[in-house]
């Protein structure tokens, strides 16, 4: 691992931290559940995207950029999508309306997460491109006695799997009550879940051995992870809310279809998010999308930069609940404003930060160490380069703000005027110009020309 400490990650499957040992160090594989593209992603959705982006970056640093495969899916077949399509595009044929909804939502999702400084995953499969793979797994499950056909549906028989519930660690009856699973007369057991359901003439559907229909939610991720990562892979991630039933049912499907002991060796889950101390919901009036936060004044009466949202998320450990607030965003913004805009060059990330990340992705300690490095970077060029390399690893590399040419010319003129005032020993006027520029976010740096020894002043836009 090239000087890195052992990477320890908390495994929901075992309820303990474990040293990460990839199945194949030349191809480290991670799957994270992506968005269902019926509505713009909200700030709660942003948390797993950011958390697992940091892990992706860390794995690439440790094992090499070409030796990590990160799959994050797009769920583009779902009853919520159908309902949104009918609501938003009542004049279009359903398939066209669905396409209009999913394409617009997926495009917005990509734009949003790019503004949060997230790398693109190695592969981003859509559910609709993997229907054949889903039906193949379902056929296997029927063939080996883990699934059955009833009332036009294919259902997974939860009692057929001796250790069903290994992830949530709860008795089956308790799981069903907690997840409010509907009890249908055609089910063998109340906890049995749908693998395939028939579609009416006005619903999207695909031909299958069980008639024209569409997949259940859980089978989608089993099929896509199998196709791109194999029967067993290294890490599966998502939010706490996905442990049951989604991830539990993924495990059941995949293990029973492929005859494996596990689906993924490590299961990671990020904590819940509240907004100003309350659960986020449309009924509470505190539902905030990523797009709204970045581009409207809906939260705190202003727009917030993507890097502020990213840092605000990383200032809480990924396993802990997070109270998302204006105060938290302001704190993150103040911190970012103190960080220099420097280039990493050939520098390596800071060892203290790497140690923190290797300790179950402790971004809280990592951010604290990064801030200390930023303070040193103001006077130490070597620390500056190391800071930039470390910030880049976290997806927090400060960017120099762009400025209009006309504004730049005006700043140049004021800087030149200040130099004239200094030459004339009119320090009061020179200070006035400096203060005026500082108030507008322009930072001046005085120095000497190496050849002539004359005073020179450079400037940059502060963050």
From Swiss-Prot:
Q: Entry cofactor note text?
A: Binds 1 zinc ion per subunit.
Q: What is its EC number?
A: 6.1.1.16
For the motif 'KMSKS' region, give the residue ranges.
279-283
GO molecular function terms attached to this record: ATP binding; cysteine-tRNA ligase activity; zinc ion binding
Residues where ATP binds: 282
Per its UniProt record, the required cofactor names are:
Zn(2+)
Where it mainly occurs, coarsely classed, is cytoplasm
This protein's source sits in the domain of life called: Bacteria
Q: Where do the annotations place Zn(2+) binding?
A: 33, 221, 246, 250
Top EC class per UniProt?
A: ligase
Cystines in this chain:
none
Task: Indicate what this protein is called per its UniProt record.
Answer: Cysteine--tRNA ligase
Q: Which organism is it from?
A: Rhizobium leguminosarum bv. trifolii (strain WSM2304)
Organism placement in taxonomy:
Bacteria, Pseudomonadati, Pseudomonadota, Alphaproteobacteria, Hyphomicrobiales
